[in-house]
Amino acid sequence: MQNPTQTMHIYDMPLRVIAGLSTLAKTTEEDDNTSTGIVVSEVGEPQVVNHPAWIDPFVAYQLRAPRKNITPDFIFGRADIGNAFSAFLPRRFSAPAVGTRLVVDPVFTYQQRTVLGLYNYFHADFYYIVHVPAPLGTGIYLKIYAPEFDTTTVTRGIRFKPSASPTIALSVPWSNDLSTVETSVGRVGQSGGSIVIETIEDNSNETVNTPLSITVWCCMANIKATGYRHADTSAYNEKGMNFISVPVPKPPVPPTKPITGEEQADNEVTAEGGKLVQELVYDHSAIPVAPVVETQAEQPEVPVSLVATRKNDTGHLATKWYDFAKISLSNPANMNWTTLTIDPYNNVTLSRDGESMVLPWRRNVWTTGSKSIGYIRTMVAQINIPRPPQISGVLEVKDSINNSSISLVEFGGKVEIPIIPKVMNGLATTASLPRHRLNPWMRTAESKVELQYRIIAFNRTSDIADLNVSVLLRPGDSQFQLPMKPDNNVDTRHFELVEALMYHYDSLRIRGEEQSLPENAPNAVSNPQQFITPATALSAEEYNVHEALGETEELELDEFPVLVFKGNVPVDSVTSIPLDLATIYDFAWDGEQNAISQKFQRFAHLIPKSAGGFGPVIGNYTITANLPTGVAGRILHNCLPGDCVDLAVSRIFGLKSLLGVAGTAVSAIGGPLLNGLVNTAAPILSGAAHAIGGNVVGGLADAVIDIGSNLLTPKEKEQPSANSSAISGDIPISRFVEMLKYVKENYQDNPVFPTLLVEPQNFISNAMTALKTIPIEVFANMRNVKVERNLFDRTVVPTVKEATLADIVIPNHMYGYILRDFLQNKRAFQSGTKQNVYFQQFLTVLSQRNIRTHITLNDITSCSIDSESIANKIERVKHYLSTNSSGETTEEFSRTDTGLLPTTTRKIVLGESKRRTERYVAETVFPSVRQ
């Protein structure tokens, strides 16, 4: 019985050229070079070649007759590598002097070299594209052929005039007296895949800079190998494959009495089936070439039906090209790449008043793009190169800094290039958080894109030295989710500090495999007219909901509500209730053991059944407030998942309004139960509503009956006490996880559990007296999960602290977002305000911290502060960030001087009062503070 043959699929074709050369004919009908004498062929008419590494078919002259090669099938180990990892790689050569020859040897990619290194023998075919930029006055005449035996032997080939047709393609099939040769040795006298370029005549004008530059692309294709090379039977291991145990706490051992135990039998656990990998289908959105005047552009298609949908946020932006940068193109000294970074959130050039490019990024939390080419791309850059006839060349542009797709822009040509977000370019150095590789959404503030360019062909006359080219931008396929109220601008002098906090502390490196999901029909669409704030999305964010995993456990125990909070909360202030469900305490009883915590102890995996606008949903919360009849007011509430913890912290610190984030509900209580149509529930898209103590308003049923257009008259309305409505909403978790697998360290580095924010407002009594606090209770259930992998004989279990709420964990990659919110708030610079106190505490904690992956809310609020001004604290943190990598210690950082020279852009007078210094800083950031 023959050993089985295995198949490997290589997706996304690295280094594929997606915009080719206009001077390279695509069909034989287009090519009339032989009939007009531009090309003199000794090898017949050109043939059409299709290769996956080049977007279009092209015609190529066959320098050798193709043959059917034999691959010996009796030697152990064979591989049909084919065109996997093939790419057209450019090189530049100087044209040889008249009567001399240039031998161009073939090259192949690093990936091909790695795969071919597994075998001893191979054969392959080669393709060449030769391009000679021909500025005005070029008169060179070239001959190209495939060599034989030695450098003086000439074979049949082609002659062509670059001034009339600067680009020509060649096919060099395998030719050898042996069907395969040794990969690293070869055979004396073999032809190989090389070509020879000879200059026959050069009648170029004296103004043309010589020697002329010739660009040659080479592609090795149709590779077959035999003779497995490595007889290595060693076993290798990488950390990402292993079971990594949670550290087990060691109990103290009494010195006199050793602990003895009994032998226990091992119980084998049957592993559940893994997740199926299926190709996702992404639709390409229409980006108008010539948009209709005074008309919005069409909305881009979502990358996959499982992600949340929203209204068109870029309809007007997509009709205009925005100037971004000017680049200069001149004769390059080498083939190095130049990187152009575009930050659509912070860039000053894109932040002009009016219909600014940055606006959609600044008024939303999440953004994604289109997967029409196989991977996510967002913004579109246009490179349009005007040129005079005295200069000629080709610009090579990549849509990321990785080996992704390539566009070739001829001088005088134009190309539009969608660009890959930096955090999704596939490099381990850029995707630092799990959500960057597990979910297609990224935060708008981290949506930088990068493109790289280099000149691969360049010839000119002495009349001109370089070209200036404008890079234009459009939002392209960018789309957004989770709208917020607009933010204030941050002083540009603080950009580098915010950037450093976002990227300096972001040092996590987590490996894993991103898997795709089958497309499922989305849940019912919500009715946004019901809600006082925008809905988080018009449909559920289901990308990481895996319906095939787990089983539903029907226990009456799950129907018991868990009282997760009980107490007085201040009016007109945001109260945070962390819903760390794995360690939740039931305040209704001595609740270390409760329906929720017990589920985490019994199972390793808790899998959400459905999703809402924020992402996967595991249950619901319900808020109750038992107030006397003479008291009335309203309650704002929203539950923000762990990947939005910075949004929660900013509202706790009073930097942003709770009404400024989508999904916040306003519930009127006391007096008339419903004042007009104020919704009493957060937008519930998950279909998982299990309200406690009343009927949920704002769920899917309401979306169907459309309560917004079917209001009852006052006489028809029920009395408030007859059928009370529950103040309820979803409990979402971070969108990048498929299941809850609680490991405390992981959930501190990348929070998953949500924070419930509650803000009572305008509570007054019959005597029109304002209340300072009101008593509330918050119940929660976790009835929207399936279970998987039972656990027995556990040693490490989630710790539930008696009558204690969990602390809010702020991971290091969120520091920059919170700092930005402080810098946008003018009260943070006004002495005596709570925002100013929190700002000082936050900066102090940053300056005192050791190497940690997170801080907690309590670390900030319990931090003592001194009389040092905000301005000095900011400069101190800047100094710390700029010198920490060189080995500065915490003791060094506690110095009173910052080690910085005074700057002219910001006057910091240490001898003046703290109040005057901070007022100056506030006025420089917020001119409206001046009075």
Curated annotation (Swiss-Prot):
Domain of life: Viruses
UniProt GO cellular component terms: viral capsid
Transmembrane segments: none
Record keywords: Capsid protein, Virion
Keyword Ion transport recorded: no
PTM description: Proteolytic processing of ORF4 polyprotein yields the VP4a, VP4b and VP4c capsid proteins.
Location(s) in or outside the cell: Virion
Main location: virion
Function, in words: ORF4 polyprotein codes for VP4a, VP4b, and VP4c, three of the four proteins that self-assemble to form the icosahedral capsid. The capsid is made of VP3 (coded by ORF3), VP4a, VP4b and VP4c.
Name assigned to this protein: ORF4 polyprotein
Top-level taxonomy: Viruses, Riboviria, Orthornavirae, Pisuviricota, Pisoniviricetes
